[in-house]
Amino acid sequence: MLREYKLVVVGGGGVGKSALTIQLIQSHFVDEYDPTIEDSYRKQCTIDDQQVLLDVLDTAGQEEYSAMREQYMRTGEGFLLVYSINSLNSFQELNSFYDQILRVKDSDNVPVLVVGNKCDLEMERQVSYEDGLALANSFNCPFLETSAKQRINVEEAFYGLVRNINQYNAKIAEAEKQQQQQQQQQNANQQGQDQYGQQKDNQQSQFNNQINNNNNTSAVNGGVSSDGIIDQNGNGGVSSGQANLPNQSQSQRQQQQQQQEPQQQSENQFSGQKQSSSKSKNGCCVIV
């Protein structure tokens, strides 16, 4: 399917907008002036080895058609701003046309091309080539002088506008691509930060679990410090030698405690007998 370009020809009355358009489409010059309200023309052509379809809208230059012109401007992709080199007034009008385009398109950058028409009327020139070029530079767009009568730079003007549209679209696409890449980079950076934060949280959680496990192990092993001191709750009841064996199983500790109980009972009995003997000696009496 052919790429279609919607071109709008804008300028004051009598500058040769229709003559330029008809010369491009039909390759002949219209000598008489017939004020245009709206004419649309289509032409298939080859530009830079690409088959394209030009949809050219020739608009009215009269001020009374300003509202209608705004409607045409909304649909246009690119604009030919045409003045006549033998009319200073038509040259000065281009500023208002350009401002109207920017306002309607709601943009500060629109594909346009400034055309100084009727360059065959050199003896009647009122606008110098340098002034036309300076105006185009202020619009940041190309500039050509044309002659619809002598078919000078007619195709170049329309084709140049198409190239300007392509350059404009390429810049827009590049800007959108860069913006998308920046957004992707920001998302990647944010994802990396989230992963790093999650990793730190996991490490902290593992560390806390390890501390809790160590505390639980100490409680199970009798609550004894490294020097064999029983904890404040009196748990454990084991000697310092047992405290140095934190990895003993519970059954082993019970066996050791059972072995110590008979020995402790014998010691208690011996201590009781000794105390009874002492009391007998101290409690004897003498009969007189």
Swiss-Prot record:
Lipidation (S-palmitoyl cysteine): C284
Gene Ontology biological process terms, A to Z: signal transduction
Membrane topology per record: Lipid-anchor
Database matches in InterPro entries: P-loop_NTPase (IPR027417), Small_GTP-bd (IPR005225), Small_GTPase (IPR001806), Small_GTPase_Ras-type (IPR020849)
Cysteine methyl ester: residues carrying this PTM: C285
Reaction(s) catalysed (UniProt annotation): GTP + H2O = GDP + phosphate + H(+)
Binding-site positions, GTP: 11-18, 58-62, 117-120
Comp. bias regions, Low complexity: 178-216, 246-281
Keyword annotations: Cell membrane, GTP-binding, Hydrolase, Lipoprotein, Membrane, Methylation, Nucleotide-binding, Palmitate, Prenylation
Disulfide cysteine pairs (residue numbers): none
Motif window: Effector region: 33-41
GO CC annotation: plasma membrane
Superkingdom of the organism of origin: Eukaryota
Lipidated residue numbers (S-farnesyl cysteine): C285
Propeptide positions: 286-288
First-tier enzyme category under EC: hydrolase
Pfam family, one: Ras
Localization, UniProt: Cell membrane
Family: Belongs to the small GTPase superfamily. Ras family.
Function: Required for the regulation of both a MAP kinase signaling pathway and a cAMP signaling pathway. The activation of these pathways contributes to the pathogenicity of the cells through the induction of the morphological transition from the yeast to the polarized filamentous form.
This protein's name: Ras-like protein 1
Organism of derivation: Candida albicans (strain WO-1)
